[in-house]
C-alpha cells in the first residue's frame, strides 16, 4: 500500500485484478476487469494485486510528475517477468522518497492481506 499526491485513473485493458481504494470511510478491495475504470484521488492510500495467472495491462492517466517516476523505476515490458533484485528494491525505495511517496508498513499492508518482505532504504 502506498500514497502520493498525484491522482491516478486506471482503465483496465487486459487481465483481472483487485484494487484497494477508499470506500465508505475505509479501504476496500474492488475487483476490476477489462473495460473497468478506477479513479484514485491524490493522497489516497491504495494498492493493486493481480489475482489471476494472466498479466494485467492498465491505461494509466496521471500527472507528468508521476509519469517521470514510472519512467525512473519501471522495467521494460520486454524484460522477462522476474522478482525485483535487492538493488532494484533499494532504488525504488530511494525514488519513492525523492518523489514524496509514502509506503505503508508491513503491518499496515498485512491488515489488508498484503504480505511484503521487510526491506529498508
Spans of features found by a protein language model:
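Jelly-roll (double-stranded beta-helix
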Residues: 1, 5-6, 16, 20-121
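Structured binding elements
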Residues: 10
Amino acid at each position: 500500500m502506498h500514497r502520493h499526491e498525484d491522482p491516478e485513473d486506471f482503465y483496465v485493458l487486459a487481465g483481472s485484478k483487485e484494487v484497494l481504494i477508499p470506500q465508505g470511510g475505509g479501504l476496500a478491495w474492488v475487483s476490476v476487469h477489462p473495460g473497468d475504470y478506477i479513479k484514485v484521488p491524490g493522497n489516497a492510500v491504495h494498492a493493486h494485486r493481480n489475482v489471476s495467472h494472466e498479466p494485467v495491462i492498465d491505461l494509466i492517466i496521471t500527472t507528468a510528475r508521476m509519469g517521470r517516476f514510472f519512467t525512473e523505476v519501471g522495467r521494460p515490458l520486454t524484460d522477462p517477468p522476474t522478482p525485483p533484485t535487492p538493488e532494484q528494491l533499494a532504488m525504488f525505495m530511494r525514488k519513492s522518497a525523492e518523489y514524496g511517496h509514502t509506503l505503508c508498513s508491513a503491518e499496515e499492508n498485512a491488515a489488508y492481506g498484503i504480505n511484503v518482505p521487510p526491506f529498508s532504504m
